[in-house]
Each structure stands twice: as C-alpha cells, then as structure tokens.
UniProtKB/Swiss-Prot annotation:
Localisation: Cell inner membrane
UniProt xrefs under HAMAP family: ATP_synth_delta_bact
Major location (coarse): membrane
InterPro entries reported in the protein's UniProt record: ATP_synth_OSCP/delta_N_sf, ATPase_OSCP/d_CS, ATPase_OSCP/dsu
GO cellular component: plasma membrane; proton-transporting ATP synthase complex
SUPFAM superfamilies (UniProt xref): N-terminal domain of the delta subunit of the F1F0-ATP synthase
Function: F(1)F(0) ATP synthase produces ATP from ADP in the presence of a proton or sodium gradient. F-type ATPases consist of two structural domains, F(1) containing the extramembraneous catalytic core and F(0) containing the membrane proton channel, linked together by a central stalk and a peripheral stalk. During catalysis, ATP synthesis in the catalytic domain of F(1) is coupled via a rotary mechanism of the central stalk subunits to proton translocation. This protein is part of the stalk that links CF(0) to CF(1). It either transmits conformational changes from CF(0) to CF(1) or is implicated in proton conduction.
One Pfam assignment: OSCP
Membrane topology: Peripheral membrane protein
MF annotations from Gene Ontology: proton-transporting ATP synthase activity, rotational mechanism
Organism: Klebsiella pneumoniae subsp. pneumoniae (strain ATCC 700721 / MGH 78578)
Name by which UniProt lists this protein: ATP synthase subunit delta
Name of the gene encoding the protein in the UniProt record: atpH
Length: 177
C-alpha cells in the first residue's frame, strides 16, 4: 500500500460522493484513470516535483488532459494542484475503485433446499434478502435431500434454517435437555 493513501482517501471520497450524486461513477473513474496515467509520465513527474506555481501546474496538467476531463474533473485537478497533491492521483484512483467496489457489493446468498425452487420462490427470497441485507443479492442454489423440506439460507455468518431437518434437530435438543 502506498504511503500516499491517507492523503488520497479524502479526494477519492469527495470525487466518489460527487460521482454517485450525479450518476457519473463510470465517467469519473475514466477521468481519474487518465489523470493518473498522466502523472506517471516522466516529464509530468518532473513537473510535479518541481517548483511550478500551483496555477501554472494545474493549467499545464489540464491542457495535457484536454477533453478527457470535464469541468468538475478540472476543478478537482485545480484543488489538488493548490495543495501540491497531484502526485497522489494514482492513489486517488485506487481508493475510488475501492469505494466503487464496496458500494456495488453483491451479497452471495446460499439457498439449500430438498427440491428445485420455482422462479417465483427464488424471486421472493431475493427480495426478502435484499431488504434484510440492504444490498443486491446473488443466489447460489443447492439441492440437498437431507433437508427433507423447507430451506436453509446462508449469507456470510447469518444462517436462517427453515428446514424440517433443522426443526427435528432443535426438537431433539429440547427433548434431551
């Protein structure tokens, strides 16, 4: 992990929040990727480490990026140049990608049943689990005859056992105690 991650994180968070608010996450990621590549250019790296005034540096950087940056992307470059932070653009991109992945996370949910479930049943399970987990859900369905009837749902460390086998096991535990 780069030493600049702590510096890059607030810029990435601000860019990501703005991108989500304006429904332009893909566009922002593309702009950041292009700008990060520009900073890796040897001549640009030399300019970034030099003693150019922030205004001059941001103007040069924006001129090099051209049409790749929209007005908001240019504003980010200006702010980062004023704070002498353009060299952390690759880390801003990396943090932006992490934020995007986290926001688009899909929960893997395992559904175990004795028989094949209908599309309607699967849709109801997806709807209920998305509501409960507050994120998109991808079902991995398995058939296990030992379940007997009902279903077992596993999502991370959460287990919902609505199977006949589970009920029988709980009943046996109660009778033995």
């Amino acid at each position: 992990m780069s030493e600049f991650v702590t510096v890059a994180r607030p810029y990435a968070k601000a860019a990501f929040d703005f991108a989500v608010e304006h429904n332009s996450v893909e566009r922002w990621q593309d702009m950041l990727a292009f700008a990060a590549e520009v900073t890796k250019n040897d001549q640009m790296a030399e300019l970034l480490s030099g003693a150019l005034a922030p205004e001059t540096l941001s103007e040069a950087f924006i001129a090099i990026c051209g049409e790749q940056l929209d007005e908001n992307g240019q504003n980010l470059i200006k702010v980062m140049a004023e704070n002498n932070r353009l060299k952390v653009l690759p880390d801003v991109l990396e943090q932006f990608i992490h934020l995007r992945a986290a926001s688009e996370a899909i929960a893997e949910v395992e559904v175990i049943s004795a028989n094949q479930l209908s599309d309607e049943q699967l849709a109801r399970i997806v709807s209920a689990m998305e509501k409960r987990l507050s994120r998109k859900v991808k079902l991995n369905c398995k058939i296990d005859k030992s379940v007997m009837a009902g279903i077992i749902i596993r999502a991370g460390d959460m287990v919902i056992d609505g199977s006949v086998r589970g009920r029988l096991e709980r009943l046996a535990d109660v009778l033995q105690s």
